[in-house]
């Protein structure tokens, strides 16, 4: 960073303040009332996130639950107040050290502002030593954008402690496709029949994301450069639906993906259990 430390800090604080003001103005302009204690399926205040990080951390053995509790307690509101969103946070099944979360930003420029405000701010400065001591790797990060406006990530309202006393429910699935260069769009079209079968098997599609091929404008946080990738996200009611309906369909359509000729390797299916305060979860109103 250029300039004196004091100047740089003032500039960061001003940029962060402007981002917060912009977010608050947007929220007031778009706000709509709803009955108290009712969890809405969609909140207009949470629109227009066009940049996402799909972050897969490795946590020290035996410490994942502790890390998840720190995350749920400290981070969701901290990001929201800066105009970003923790769209979902999860424990990876079949990987005892895997913690995955999705962070959204309105634009790529806002990403840099939010990161500077957060990682040079008071919340992270107070807790970074504790959290960094629990993380063994945090560099497995995909920088993504929605495939199209219609396939944007589903940003659900925050957990309501009154109507959802047991915390986030359901199962989230993420399927990651390593796509050949310049073939993402055609692969997405040819994969649509398979994705339609996922939805028919009980999955609520929560977004389709593809690699955002831009320069990392906050290089202090590395991102992967081995793309392109396509990530399909879905939410299931419970384990029974996952095992009885969804998993068999993924096995049946595997040949479609292989025969397409557009992939660099086999798709990776990740089964994710939401942390108690994860936004991305199965809503009580979804029957």
Give the residues covered by each predicted segment.
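An amphipathic, aromatic/His-enriched active-site/gating alpha helix that lines ligand/cofactor pockets
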Residues: 30-47, 69-88, 95, 104-147, ...
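Short, solvent-exposed loop/turn elements at beta->coil junctions and helix N-caps
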Residues: 90-91, 211
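Short, low-order "capping/linker" segments at domain edges
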Residues: 222, 277-287
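Short, low-complexity N-terminal intrinsically disordered segments enriched in polar/charged residues
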Residues: 41-49, 161-167
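Surface-exposed interaction/gating patches
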Residues: 54-58, 66, 148-219, 224-239, ...
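Short acidic/glycine-enriched loop/turn segments that link adjacent beta-strands
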Residues: 94-97, 215
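Bacterial N-terminal signal peptides that target proteins for export
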Residues: 1-17
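Bacterial N-terminal signal peptides
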Residues: 15-25
